[in-house]
Amino acid sequence: MASEQDGFLPAATRGDSNWSGVSGWESALSAMRAEVPSIDSDDSSLSDCEEEELHIFQREDTNLIPDLSIELLDDGELNSEVVTRQMSLEKVEFSDSLEPSPNVCVPLSVQKAELDDTINSRNPETEQLCPEPIDNIQTESMVGIKDSEKEDGFRHVLHSSVTTVLKPQINSNVDSEYEIHPGNTEKEHLSTSALSSKPVGLSLQFLECLEQWDLNALLHQLKEEEVQEREMPPLILSMEESTERRHKLIMEKLVEFAAQQSEEVSSVPQLEEKEKEGTISKSSFRPYPDQKMYLKGSGKHPQSFSTICLDLRTTVSKMGQVTSLEQNPENPSQRNEQKEKHHLNKTDHTGKSLLLRNRHNIQNDSLSDANMSNSESLSKEKKELGTPTQRKQRPKSKVDISPKLQEMVGREEKDGREEQEKEKEILQYLPPKSLINSRADEFAQREKQEKEKKARLRMLTQLEDLKPRSSVNGRQPMAEATPILFHPETSYCPGISSLPDVARSGVETLLLTICLSSCGQVFIPGQHGARSSYPSLFLANTFHCLLTWLISLVPGVNTHGKVNAPFHVLGLQQAWQEEGLALYACLSPRQIATQSSPKIRKHKGKQDLRGTSSFYQRVSLFLSHNTLQSVIWWSEDVVERLQGKLFPLPTEVPAVRLSSIATLNSAPEAVEKVFSSACGFYWQTLETEEKINPLLSEIPTDSETEVVSVIVFERMLSNPTAFHHTLHIIQTEGLDVCGVRLLYPQANALHSYIDTVPSSYTGGDGQTLPVLALALRGTQAEHIWAEIAGPFDPQLARLTDQYSLNAMYGFKRGEPIMHWARKSGRLLQELSLWFGGRIPPSGSFNIGFQNPYSRSTQPRSANLRSRSDSEKDVTAFHDTDRCRPPALLTASILGDVFLVVSPAVPSAAYGDVIDICLHRGFALYGLRRLRLSAKRSAMLSMSSTQVSIFCPNVPHSQTDAQPCRQPRLHCFLLLLRKENAAHHTSGLIQALMNELAERGLLGAIHAKFSYICEVDPSFCFHVAPYTDNLLQSLGGSLHAMPDLSTVPMDMLSLRPFASDPEDEQVVVLTMSGKHTLRRAGYFLQKILRPTLKTPASNTGSVHDGFELLGLKWLPSLSRLQAKEITPYEVGDRPWQRSIEHLISNPALLCALRRSNAFAVLQHTIKQLAPTLGMEHPQLIASATPEIAFRQAALIFSDRDLVSDPESRSSLMYIPPTGINCRAGGTEDRRGTTESIFTYMLSGPPVLYTVLLLKPRIWSSALGKILYKVHQQKFILVGMKPVSLTTAMCSQILPEDVKKSEALCLTHCDYLTSGPCLALCLQRRGAVLKLLDVLGPEDPELCRAQDQFLWRAQYGTSAVQNGMYGSTSYQAAIRDIKTFFPEGLLFEESTVLQAEQIPKLTSDILVCSRSHRQTVKNPACGPELPTTDLPFTSALCQTTCLLFPPHMLRTSPPPYIPALEQLMAKEFHITAARLTAFDQLQAQLVAEMYSPGNYLTAKIKLLTEGPCLLVAAQRDNAVTCFPSLVHSDDRHNMSAQTLTEQVLCPQTESQANKMLSCFFDSLTPDSIHQILH
């Protein structure tokens, strides 16, 4: 320490060559070193001794008062000090921005701002003249102590009786000194002397050198150099007191000084005006040129801070041998020089310093006058204070002052008088002394609080650095949402007792331990009970029953009196230790009449009870003789509470004895270790037997896990039914009980923690009631618990949420049954209060070795070397004990499970399934649709009943009359991940069943199981834990991409895609991004089963939902996939950002199908997830069929895309799936599957349907009807008049009509009243399209729906509705076989070939040997003049027109306008038929129409395709046919077509022959009949 002190001594005491001293100085200095405190202490030492030190004040140099060592002292105290200061003969002028005027109070913030501006605006010349601030001038002390420079902030250095000497070096050989001698007068004597090598007498060497200087040249040089303006640094010197009175006096003045410096004093408006007028004087100080070189060479930073040194200790200084100075300088010239020196030094202070000095003078008016120079009183005072004797000075009568210096001194005297007047004005505005003291106390309190806050933040930082980074054994990373249980307030308050006072009064206690396999699950070793579908549910129910039972045994809570256990439960808590997670209970004997100890029966455990207490034996026998079912007497009440639920979780528990679940420990230190040991500040992540997919271990779950702290009061704890019901609801809602602790808080402490406390906790009777602290953990735990608990007011809860806990068990608002933090800001505080550790007063505690696994594979030496810096630097913790302290809050590692959805659940509910899983906190990591075999079901541990449901077979027979309803064969497989996943699977299944019931989907499921009364959850869902072998047996990776090499080349080539919106289209939907995937189930639910109607499509589809073809979840997309999926083009600006977003986020991709799929899906996306203002859309749909095909080929394989017959809206209007295989003659015995890729390329197949025009409709409107048929893109492949029988009529009647016999008879009478015209139409989706354009059966409903529907135009009533259309695909095939048994006129068709419908190649009526004859209709004869039949004129004729094939093939077909032209010319059609001729028939027909003329050409024309035969009647229809057609407009194209291209008879006999050859019947209103 001596060497260090020597380093701080000034150059004079270290033997500097420029300093001459004697042994007297050295002896004085050596005597004082022992009393001087060390100045080299670091910050850490200061922080450790904060209570022992008194930190007065610290401020930057610009805001401190310079040189307050004189102003703070009284005149008497000034007499006890000799302040020696070296001053230059020139002054450096300070600017107003650097130093406030002595007459104006300037705020400190303004001073600092002005100082910064001044420093920034310095010019290089000024820095060269004065590169070092004034406070860096070398200081010397007569006792040998030098102020040390600050190294790391302001350092308070204490030393005694320091006299500062500011010594500028003029040159290497000459030193000068100015001494200020405060005497009994107010005048100060200015003297100059040179330092000599002798202790007595002063050398005149300095004065001799001074006489040789040219002061005029020196002043001129200083004016040119523009010296930088600076403020004299402050220096508060320590005072050495000899009495207690003086010690208190200096303390009061220091407090006053600190208060004035810390608070801004408002200035007077008059002073502000004077400052603006420039009346404030400026002080200046200029060093010598040689002094500037000394400062430049000192090497100190210009902005370094000075050290404020105070010595508040009352130490006794040692007298040293010093040189004596003359006490009565009588030389007048010396007094004048001192007076000039006083004026020179006076302006070196700020206004505040001068103000303080004047105030000291006013307060000490009682002291002796400043002009007195009584040497005896001075000498006596110095002896009392122990001040060294002053050195004598030689008279300086020979020294002459230059005229310029005298002028300067005169100016300063004038300025000094003005300053004194201004100081008197300022004194009246000073605050009172009491206010200064209160502000000082407030400042000290704030400083203390700030230090405590910083210390606690450092503690938090150290705890964060040592936080566990993984699970207890390092298998997985630390669970999320596990904050450090540290709070700046609660962690320093006293801990809450976990045992009552009676447990510490010497009563016998036992430790009951119940091992837990995970949070909320009891570990039962050697469990061999009956096989259960939900083994985890049994373990959870066991935990609920045990916890409720132990709570019911707590004294003060047990009010029901139904307990027969021989013990009380005093303490209860769930804690993790190195041995694992367990529920601990402290047992004590009951305070009732002593029971006789039962005899120990002879059994195997008898040896274990020897040497134990009777209490231990009673408890042990009770546990071994009772089961859990026998002690839960309230179980039936809990079952009654669950009756209102649709699918409540069962509450059964395994029939095991309590001794197989719990163990006893009679050691006294066992209870002490569990309930009295200091708990830790960290969560621990418990490891279970669950596994996760290693390929997906790096993908975060992002499950929004939250924690809730709940305090259960005595009213709830005393009701076992209520508490057990609460635990059951927590399990049902998917929350983990991660912390349980029974506490005994004091009444006043409990009121300070909780706002509203029940009245039973007032503590008036001296009894401390317990509370139970629960910590709940799960996804959105705060929201879920708020719904479970309900509103705080029980009356309001009963109105708004009758199933909440407050509604069922609450009493009144002022008597709560529970408390939980409703504000998220209080969560950490409450967790730290109830479950966190405490910081001891010493600040040293054990946190154990939190990450031992990370160094278990390294040598011990390597482990020590690899320790992080945070662990090395922590001094408050002891990690020598590698055992981790108990953790009262635990989380579980992540686990994967397979959820299998049976085929009985419709695919339209898959969105609901995904949404419930995500809502319950399960993260989605894979999807697949697959068929289960018996082997796979066995690996999934399914029961025999489940196998028959999850592995259905194909039905063997189907009726042709009903639509093909092939059952769903594929299951839906999901890979889910969650903390403690196996524990929550039972609650997940229960939530899924409730969701299906609320959506109304259980009816469809129950219809498939007609042999059962209720739908069991096991029929719909099955859960299996994840294993790698199970994943491989289920088809391998769920994220496998298709192999593009297996795709046929013709699929990848350029080709047209079916894009008709009326057909079924396949579209690919992509959901990308974590935020989007959280709502993926909701989006899919609205798409598959929409509740809002989408805009009506042109097809008028009867179902608005989509058919789900494929689902796939991918952890990320490849760049090739992202380029196909992005909605932007390459030239778009956001294209690149969209690609990066897609490849860096998981995605869920769906393949969907329905009619007009692209337009409907785009409209749905706009409603669900608007993209306005979003750079990355949440939902991306493929824009065209070609893009959809490319996206599907990159993502799905042909096995991944599976059609869903039950959810396909158009299933009954399309052929069955295996139609192609049946056409080829091959069929798989397990059923055929549709290739979606083939469907996307070829589109839907061409179908056929039957349109039946009912009697008296088609004869007058056939042309218009055929025109409408052509408008809807139908192709006519068959047409013939048919006469219906009763059997035929019943075949085409609707099902609701068949139920009424009278209504059925009415329909049959109408249908048999005349021939109907049957038309067979061809197009894609023909069946559904025809039903769409026909409309409802009732024409009135048609007109209300759309007036352009066909039945609305041609129907008159529900019976005479005009038309009939095939109602399904199977009905269409049946109608074709009924009305067209001879076949149809079609090209090659796979559907008709599969349905065995022949192709018509020749006409079945045209024959040369036909015996049919055409005769006049008797009903139209002249003997019946009153008949209402039309066309009864004698001139009426019937013609037979033949439309050749070329008129039917072209588009638009010319035959339709020709028929309309006939209708316009009042022709009445009596028969029409579409037929085809072979070669012989064509020759016969050609000869009939034009015998001998162009026979060969006509034969060729007739055999090119189908021909249309039409029988029409009118007056002169045969003889005047050309003139009738051209009568109005000869330029009409339809008329020209009829005359030029249509074949017509020339004579009436020829026409009659044709009618008998081509038709077998005519309409009843025809003038002719065909006789057979």
Swiss-Prot record:
Subcellular location(s) of the protein: Dynein axonemal particle; Cytoplasm
MF terms in GO: dynein complex binding
The entry's keywords: Cytoplasm
GO cellular component, as recorded: axonemal microtubule; dynein axonemal particle
Polar residues compositional bias, start-end: 324-335, 361-374, 849-865
Start-end of Basic and acidic residues biased regions: 336-351, 409-426
Gene deletion effect: Mutant multiciliated cells show a severe loss of ODAs from motile cilia.
Disulfide-bonded cysteines: none
UniProt keyword Cytoplasm present: yes
Span list, region Disordered: 1-21, 262-304, 324-428, 849-871
InterPro entries referenced in this protein's UniProt entry, alphabetically: DNAAF8 (IPR031531), NDK-like_dom (IPR034907), NDK-like_dom_sf (IPR036850)
Segments for region (NDK): 1249-1382
GO biological process, alphabetically ordered: outer dynein arm assembly
UniProt key word Cytoplasm: yes
Tissue distribution of the protein: Expression is enriched in multiciliated cells in the epidermis and the nephrostomes of the pronephros.
Subunit: Interacts with DNAI2.
Matches recorded under PANTHER family: DYNEIN AXONEMAL ASSEMBLY FACTOR 8 (PTHR43109:SF3), NUCLEOSIDE DIPHOSPHATE KINASE 7 (PTHR43109)
Record function comment: In cyliated cells, dynein axonemal particle-specific protein required for deployment of ODA to the axoneme. Interacts with outer dynein arm (ODA) subunits.
Name the record gives this protein: Dynein axonemal assembly factor 8
